[in-house]
Amino acid sequence: MQAVVVGAGIGGLAATIALEHAGVEPIVLERAPELREAGFGLVLSANAVMALDSLGLRDVVATRGARVTQAEIRNPRGELLTLIDYEAHGWETYGILRSSLQQAMLEAIPFDRLRLNTTCIGANEDGRALLDDTDPVTGEIVVGADGINSAIRRSLFGEEPLRYGGHRAWRAGTRFEDGRIGERFVEVWGVGGGFGFGPAGRGRVYWYCFESVPEGAPAPEQPRGSSSAATAPGSTLFRP
């Protein structure tokens, strides 16, 4: 049996590894000419860790990521609102950079399974993935893992407009090795926004800030000063 997986992101690569384990021969179609670092961090909770363990990736995640034993939610004054103790519940949780997880998945897949610079424009229910410049690729299974603007979804189910979630965000990974963050993930809730951070492995910290804005609102030219009371004072968040 052969399967066609469209998209070489986290979901597509996970599906490819699972299909390999099930004895199916998958081929992965990726429109990018090369796989570059994309996105920033992930928090892998217990269910995700169990899923990755079933793919043979748990030890890699533990090595390349960072253990997270608790999560904290705080107000702008730094006062604790909620504490989730993952370790006490036996919930194995890790923070990891997307690029680290993606690379680990790529290493678990035979190189000849991956076809880069291949754009899929849709699929048929008979198992054909339609390409923009070559003949279709056929398999008994087609897995659409081509992201938020999925061509597979659109070709099978029609147009589905994106729904605005009410927030915009800034995200990044930063080298931070002095140990003050430890094994915790922290999110600060402010008026109309917030800020979160946590360990991502190998001396890196994943952080993000978000604010609630109407759909279509223009983004500020400079994020500095747009903390929306996420911290007190805001200058602490946006200092050079």
Where are the language model's segments positioned?
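Beta1/beta-strand and adjacent pyrophosphate-binding region of the FAD-binding site
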Residues: M1-G11
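Glycine-rich FAD pyrophosphate-binding loop
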Residues: E20-F40
